[in-house]
Amino acid sequence: MVRRAVWALLLVVSLVAPIAAHAQGDYLDVYIVKVKPEKLADFEAITKKWIDANKRFNGDTWIAMETVYGEGNVYQFTSNRQDYGEIDKINEAAMAAANKAFGKEVGEKMERDFQNCLVWSRSELRRRRWDLSRKAPADAAAYAKLIGESRVLRTTAVHVRPGRIADFEAYLKEAKEVAEKHPNTAPVFVSQVIEGTKGTTFYVSTLRSSLGGFDKNPTMRDILGEEGYKKFLQMNVEAVEDTQSTLYRFSPGLSNPPEEIARVAADFWHPKPVMAAASKSKTAAGNEAGMKPTAEKPKQ
């Protein structure tokens, strides 16, 4: 257990550095579900209906992700929130959108059908820790560009021992003073769960345009040096209870991204129904191939 925590937290400290400015909201509203294997098609169909309703009637927006490495059939839906007040406002807007699109009774049935697709679900409200994040975008446009161009996300949940939160944060800030001087570092987002979990949990998340972006990252020894690395290992044993790492890929077909993110890569975030178009084209071609001129028809 300790060894696993040590190696997962290697990622945490190596990725933490200063923040330029708040780019998009102070909170992340996160909904995580595990879908029954036999219900995947129903789950996707219902989600796409919710997407259509929220688009047409100005409801909520979100980014959907699917597990690549981690527990199977797990999906995460993440929305930005400015504050608690906006959570209420957006929830009301999403409910109103569903009622307008489907009617109250049909909307409630769809919600029951959706829940029947799930093995379990969990909601978390996470506060962005800009003071612990590294190389975050300087403004909303840069943030939208980073998210819009990303295709995979690695996130590590770090569970801190009771009474050691201050020590944990202090060490991260100390380590980042060294880590931020390293030239080969990428943006990293740190958040802390404030609603919906036991104990104290931090999430450290990194984005890449492909899995290859995780190759050839600097090691902890490269960043901290031998003495700093030893200090890190000691702190990790004393302050960290457990860690869990998950790798997700973005799911554009289940997302309803904010327009500023979608227009960065419209072909990805708003995929065209190419399968339906291709099927129609093949059917037409097949019909044409199967038809013969009257003169060529065999005589009866």
PLM-predicted stretches and their roles:
Residues M1-R4:
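N-terminal secretory signal peptides that target proteins for export/translocation
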Residues V6-W7, A295:
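Sequence-pattern detector for short linear motifs
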Residues W7-P18:
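Bacterial N-terminal signal peptides
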Residues H22-K230, M235-Q300:
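Short S/T/G/P-rich N-terminal loop/turn motif that feeds into the first structured element of a domain
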